[in-house]
Amino acid sequence: AELTPLDTTYEITEGNNLVSWPSHSSCSVGDAIPDEFEENICGVIGEGVAAIPNETFGWVGSLQLFQDGKGYWLCSDVDMYYNWDAANCEGTLSRKAEQSAAIPSGYEYKQSTEQAFYFIESIENIEMGDWILSYNDDVVIGARQWSGEITDVPTMGDDGSEYTKGYIKSGVAPSFKILRGDELINLEGDIPAFE
C-alpha cells in the first residue's frame, strides 16, 4: 500500500484532526512529534490507545509507537501547519508496539468509533496487575491494566451500532471499578462526563 509522503504538511485546526503515520518504520510518540509542535499538541488517540504530554514524564499513556498504515486523531490547541518528524525514524529498526495484557474473561468490550480516555495518576491501594474498568451502568465499556504510573483507561461510547448498544452517551459520566482477582471494588471521585 502507498503511504503518505514523508514530507506531507497537514493543515491542522484547533481540536481533533485525523492524520496518517507516513512511514513503514514504527516510531515513538516523542520522536515522531517535532519539538516545535509539542507545546501545541494536547494529545493523540489511536484505536483503543492514547497519549498525552506530561511535563515530568514526557508522553504518557498506552500509545507508545506510531505504526505503519495506522491513522491517529491529533488534538491541537491552535490552528497550524504540521508535519511529522518521520525521517527521524527512517532506517531505524521497526519496533512492534507492546501488546496489552488480555482483558479478563467476562470484562471484554467492543471498540467504538466514539471513544474517550481517562488518564489516572494514582488510586489509593491499587496494586500492579489490577485492572481499572469503566462502566455505563452495568455495562463494561473499557478496561486497562494498572501500569504503576499514569494509566489511560479507554471508555467507549454509543456510536449507534448494534455492538455499542448500552455504551455511554455524551454528557454522562462513567463509573470506574478495580478488578483484583475476582473482586470488584467501586471507585469514588469527581469524574468528568464523557465527551
Please report, for each region that a protein language model flagged, where it lies by residue.
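N-terminal exported-region signature
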Residues: 1-195
